[in-house]
Regions:
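Short coil-to-beta strand junction motifs in C2/discoidin
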Residues: 101-106, 355
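A short beta-strand element within beta-rich, extracytoplasmic domains
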Residues: 87-100, 157
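Primarily mature extracellular domains of secreted and cell-surface proteins
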Residues: 58-72, 96-101, 111-114, 128, ...
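Basic/polar, cationic surfaces and motifs that engage anionic cell-wall
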Residues: 2-6, 13, 24, 168-326, ...
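C-terminal region of N-terminal signal peptides and the immediate post-cleavage residues
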Residues: 19-57
């Protein structure tokens, strides 16, 4: 459902689910020659695996005058006609300027490369106007959240007016981006856990895993919105992010000083640590910090470091975690998670012009945790995940859609383990609340808003992300994470 996308990326609408494929157009109906002249492929240099195809939108044929028939769809104002394309697995729409809104609904459908069947139309959610423009160096494009569709060789897209009577003023440079993640740079990551039989596994984690958030002891913080009225005494807010080429420079940390650890992140996997080993590794001095969970590093999922901008952006501390979902099909295999993450990384950097992937961490349905944005998993790395609240926060995205589908217990447990450790490094109680200063978006810029220290994307931005079913798990996640910290 990058970081400023905050809205991003995490956006969630039931329409964004990958629906069962239905044969709408036979594969033979489209051939490579069907590609419109305006389509251009932009493969990467041979030195950078993967490629991106960029297709321009054409004006839709003018609809006939008169009222539309009952149930007839609104006429599209821009289209990418159905065509055969080079193989790809993820798509999204971009335009020239991030400060220009997309006043229309973008719908896409993809043709399965194996079966030749077309998916149903799926809606893409556009990031807020201005998202990413300041935080990502000022060159960010306007963009929708990306959608993973799996191996595909055909595509069709359309932009529909917001209402039947509304005129449409579209931003310049509107293009459909088709991303092939390519092979990973490394293949040293450990094999992921076995696939859950369904999106709702009936077994919890083993004894060496985090306790079940539904049964963990602790005090319930109560349901409700992640933000409370901004009344009362407010603590001073953190400063602006610092930038430096070395993670050890240009950053200030809060209590716990997680950024000062010298852990080695050059391998494919950071192994799980006991609580005692975590305290020794990160020199937490016996404070409340959960044991470090197993984390697949960027090397482990095959990140090509030539894609992203050099250097890193840091904030002073980490005061809260925002939970997202990626609003994609839940039917993927966990062994494909590295490919999905590589595709998102390429889309955020090459298509949206962000400095790096937007999320700080990603979690697949098997509960495997992946490092996201570069800069150090224990450091206060500024991401692009929750527009208006990327300062002093970390963004965690679960691969899948959880508006109507129950999130797998292994993924829920992984969020608890990750937040117990990450927030603990900075002295934060995952069952507590904190004040954050808005950078714009859902709340007026400069306004101080009170959040749960583990909040959903929808608490900080106008979106349904992380989906109603995952959002409903946040209370139990907070309780479990606090228990893992020894509170």
């Amino acid at each position: 459902m990058r970081a400023n996308l905050a809205q991003s990326i995490g956006v969630a609408s039931a329409a964004a689910l990958l629906l069962p494929l239905a044969p709408l157009v036979p594969a033979a109906a489209l051939s490579p020659s069907a590609a419109a002249p305006s389509a251009r492929s932009a493969p990467s240099s041979p030195a950078v695996p993967g490629h991106t195809q960029s297709l321009s939108f054409d004006e839709s044929p003018k609809p006939s005058a008169g009222p539309r028939a009952p149930g007839e769809k609104d006429a599209a104002v821009r289209v990418v006609s159905a065509r055969t394309v080079r193989p790809y697995s993820l798509l999204g729409v971009v335009w020239d300027r991030a400060d220009q809104p997309l006043r229309g609904r973008v719908e896409v459908r993809a043709r399965d490369a194996d079966t030749g069947r077309w998916s149903e139309w799926q809606q893409l959610e556009a990031h807020a106007s201005g998202a990413g423009s300041a935080d990502e160096g000022g060159r960010a494009r306007g963009a929708t959240a990306p959608l993973w569709v799996g191996p595909s060789d055909g595509v069709e897209a359309r932009v529909l007016p917001e209402s039947a009577t509304a005129g449409v003023s579209l931003p310049g440079g509107l293009r459909l981006e088709l991303v092939d993640p390519g092979p990973g740079e490394q293949s040293g990551a450990a094999q992921p856990p076995g696939e859950p039989k369904t999106a709702e596994p009936d077994r919890g984690p083993g004894p060496d895993k985090a306790p079940d958030p539904e049964k963990a002891p602790g005090t319930d913080t109560g349901a409700g919105s992640g933000s409370a009225p901004d009344t009362g005494t407010e603590p001073a807010t953190g400063g602006e992010p610092q930038t430096g080429s070395d993670p050890q420079t240009g950053s200030e940390t809060g209590s716990g000083d997680g950024a000062m650890s010298g852990q080695n992140e050059t391998g494919a996997v950071l192994p799980e640590l006991t609580r005692e080993a975590t305290e020794t590794e990160y020199q937490t001095g016996g404070s409340f910090v959960g044991p470090r969970p197993r984390i697949v590093t960027r090397r482990g999922w095959g990140a090509n470091e030539k894609l992203r901008e050099p250097g890193h952006a840091y904030t002073k501390t980490v005061k809260a975690a925002f939970v997202h979902h990626t609003a994609m099909s839940n039917s993927y295999k966990c062994s494909k998670a590295p490919s999905i993450i590589r595709a998102m990384y390429r889309y955020h950097v090459k298509s949206s012009k962000w400095r790096d992937i937007g999320y700080n961490f990603l979690i697949d349905k098997c509960g495997t945790i992946y490092e996201g944005r570069s800069g150090g998993v224990a450091k206060a790395v500024r991401g692009a995940h929750t527009y208006g609240f990327n300062t002093d926060t970390t963004g965690i995205a679960v691969l899948g859609s959880f508006d109507k589908t129950k999130p797998p217990q292994r993924a829920v447990d992984a969020i608890a383990r990750l937040t117990a450790w990450k927030l603990g490094l900075f002295g934060v109680d995952p069952a507590g609340r904190t004040w954050l200063k808005s950078g714009g978006g859902k709340f007026k810029k400069g306004r101080k808003i009170r959040f749960h220290t583990v909040s959903g994307h929808k608490d900080g931005y106008v979106t349904e992300c992380p989906g109603a079913r995952l959002y409903g798990k946040l209370d139990s996640i907070r309780t479990a994470a606090a228990h893992l910290q020894g509170r």
